Amino acid sequence: MRVITGKARGVQLKTPNGMLTRPTADRVKEALFSVIQFDIPGSRVLDLFGGTGQLGIEALSRGAKSAVFVDAREDACKLIRENLKRTRLQEDARVIRSDYLDYLSRCREQYDIIFLDPPYAEVFLENSLNRITEIDILHSGGIIVAERPLGKELPWDYPGYTRSRDYPYGKILLTFYRKDGGSQETI
């Protein structure tokens, strides 16, 4: 697992032992970032299920202004900090150990891009999408990127959000939602 391009291009990221964290495959990550490449420079990013930190780190490497990484597990937070140090991107990042719903309930920040790549077997994805679309933490024109397995359905309609088409990559689907207002470019 590596940083694909930008300031930290080619840096190998540490990966976890065991299966509690499932990093996004490089080819999926490359496809994801090619879709949102023009939204990244200067953006504020939330990597809600941080895991290894690779999505937020890739965004920082490509010019995001800042990234917040949230994960409930201390070992994941430690791994994210190590990967930020390896890439020398830690100054523009914060790592927060918290349950995702607890974080969302007290979050007062606004973001331009939110990455959602939770454990597949749980209801975290639906719960986080529901909560994010209820509260005001995404700027107008901001993007939510949701990674999910084939066969796991997500709602098409959230008030104030437009869902673009799904992008399939093997057994994975990337789904993009854009908050209404601001830039209305199609994803």
What spans do the regions from the language model cover?
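Class I S-adenosyl-L-methionine-dependent methyltransferase catalytic core
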Residues: 1-187
